[in-house]
Amino acid sequence: MAKVIGIDLGTTNSCVAVMDGKDAKVIENAEGARTTPSMVAFSDDGERLVGQPAKRQAVTNPTNTLFAVKRLIGRRYEDPTVEKDKHLVPFSIVKGDNGDAWVEANGKGYSPAQISAMILQKMKETAESYLGEKVEKAVITVPAYFNDAQRQATKDAGKIAGLEVLRIINEPTAAALAYGLDKKDGKTIAVYDLGGGTFDISILEIGDGVFEVKSTNGDTFLGGEDFDMRLVEYLVAEFKKDNGIDLKNDKLALQRLKEAAEKAKIELSSSQQTEINLPFITADASGPKHLTLKLTRAKLESLVDDLVQRTIAPCKAALKDAGVTAAEIDEVVLVGGMSRMPKVQEVVKQLFGKEPHKGVNPDEVVALGAAIQAGVLQGDVKDVLLLDVTPLSLGIETLGGVFTRLIERNTTIPTKKSQTFSTAEDNQQAVTIRVSQGEREMAADNKLLGQFDLVGLPPSPRGVPQIEVTFDIDANGIVQVSAKDKGTGKEQQIRIQASGGLSDADIEKMVKDAESHAAEDKKRREAVEAKNQAESLIHSTEKSLKDYGDKVSEADRTAISDAIAALKSATEATEADAEDIKAKTQTLMEVSMKLGQAIYEAQQAEGGAAADASAEEGGDNVVDADYEEIKDDDRKKSA
C-alpha cells in the first residue's frame, strides 16, 4: 500500500515527514536539509527553481523570486493585508482574473495556489526519492485560523501538485499530536505557534490517544516575515539618516537587507549583539556606499515589541472560549521558528505563569504531526482520536445585513446544523443565500465565502415559505451549504467556493501546467546529467589521445578528434538536447575503442617488459630453500 505523507506547508519553510514503523520521521531533501525554503524563482531563460536553489539566487533576481506566498493564499486583491504586503515585497502582487491576489514573475501571473503547488511538488519528490515509490496522497497542514477560502486554496494547491489531499489538519493540532502521542495521563495544553507568516493558539485536552481541541484563535498575518520587515524598515531609516539615500525603491538592496535582517534576528536569539555588514549596498556620485551597523538584542526587542504583544489577545480569547484559566494549563508547547526568540518566550511565560515546553523541534513538529495523522488515516497508527474545531463562526446574511450565525466558532468538526428562514417580501420567488465567516455582527464586515440562489418558490405572502438552510463542515474544515424549500421540496446546494477562488477548469489547467513543468524539469535534469557524462568522457579521451595517439592510425585519430568536436558542440548548445548529447557520447565511445585497445596493449607490453627486467635483475640472487610442512596436530602439541 502506497505511503501517505505529511506536509507542513509553511510561509518561510516547508517540511515533509512519513511514518517509519511506529515513529514519524522527517525526510531530508536533495540538498541534505530537513526543511526547505518556501521559495520559487524563475530565471531569465524560464528555468524554475524551488527551495534552497531559489533562495541562493534571490539577491540577484529579486523581482522573480517569490516568497511568503502563503500569506496571499485565498485572499482578495483588495484585502487590506494584501495592500500592506504589496509595498514590502520586491516582486509584483497583481489582481488575478477572479479578483484574488496573484503574483507575477517574468511578466506571467501565478495564483498563490500554483506557487504553493510547486513547493508541494518539491516535498512530494523528496518523499518519493526517500521511499523509492510514487507518492499520491498527503495530509497537509494549515494555520488553525485559516478561513474556508484559504483551506480550499490549500487543497487546490495539493491537487495541482498531483496529490490527493486526504485531510487538511490545523498546525497546532498537528504539533499536539506529535507532542502527545505517547502521553497517557490527561493534560490540558496550549500550543503557541508563531511561524513565518501566521500565529495560532490552540487549547487542547489530550490523554490516552484522544486529542480534543477546546478552542483556537490567531492572526493569519503575523509572523517572522513581519519581524524581518520591521528590522528592514529600521535599517533603511538608519542608512537614510547617515547617507541621505533612500533604499526603499532599490529592489536589489531591499533583498540584501531582508536576508541580513533574517540572519541578524536569528543570531540575536543566542547572542546579545550582532553586526550587520553589507558592503556596496548602493552608490552615488561620490562612490560606493556600505552599510555597517551594530544591533543589540534589546534594540531588536524594542522594534518588534508590539508584534509580540499582538499574540496576547488571541491567547486570552482562546483561554476564555475553552473555559479555562492560564493556571489550569499544564503545559505550553512552543511551535514555529519565531518561538525561539527569547522575548517571545518571556511573554509566553508571563502570560501562562510557567516555563514553556521546549522539548519539540519547532520547525519539524508540525510535519511529524501531519505524518501521524496520515498514519491514522492509513490504519498504521491505532487508538488515536482527533477532535478539531472550526476557528470562525459561520452563518448567512439576513434582513438588514445582519450576520446570523448557524455554527459558532470552536464547534467540534465534522458538524452539521440546520435552521429555518423565510422570505422578506410578498410573492418572492427566489432567495439569495449569502454565506459568511467571521465574528462581526454585520455580514458585510465578515468574510463572504460565497452565495447561491434558491429559485422557483411559489408566490406567497412574506414570512410564509419555510426555507431550511443547512451547513455541513467536513473534517478538513471545508463548508458545504444547502437550502431547501420545505413546501416544494426544491433544494439547492453548493460546496462553498470563495467568490474568487479557482474554478475546476482553472485547477485542471494548472494541473496540466504543473505536469508539463515536471516534464520540462525532468528534460532539463536529463540534459545536465548527459552533459556531465559527456564532459567527463571528452576530458578522459583528450588525455588518452595526447598520451597514446601515436599508437593508433591517422584515420582513427581524425575520427576521434571529429567525434570529440561534435560532442563538444552538442554540450555547448544554448538549448542542450539530452538525446543528441547521448547519441554523440555513444559515437565517441565507439570510435575511441581502438584507442582504448592501444592503451591496454601498451600497458601490457610495459608490464611484460618490467617483469622480464626484474627476473633478469634478481636471477643471481635467487635462494633455494627447503621447507617443512607442519600439520595442525603438531602445532597444537607444540603450543
Curated annotation (Swiss-Prot):
Biased composition (Acidic residues): 614-631
UniProt family annotation: Belongs to the heat shock protein 70 family.
Keywords assigned: ATP-binding, Chaperone, Nucleotide-binding, Phosphoprotein, Stress response
UniProt-listed InterPro entries: ATPase_NBD, Chaperone_DnaK, Heat_shock_70_CS, HSP70_C_sf, HSP70_peptide-bd_sf, Hsp_70_fam
Upregulating conditions: By stress conditions e.g. heat shock.
UniProt keyword annotation of RNA-binding present: no
Function noted in UniProt: Acts as a chaperone.
Gene: dnaK
Bias-annotated ranges (Low complexity): 604-613
Compositionally biased region (Basic and acidic residues): 514-529
Name assigned to this protein: Chaperone protein DnaK
GO MF annotation, one: ATP-dependent protein folding chaperone
Domain of life: Bacteria
Residues that bear Phosphothreonine: T198
Tagged with keyword ATP-binding: yes
Organism: Rhizobium etli (strain CIAT 652)
Disordered, as annotated region: 514-534, 604-639
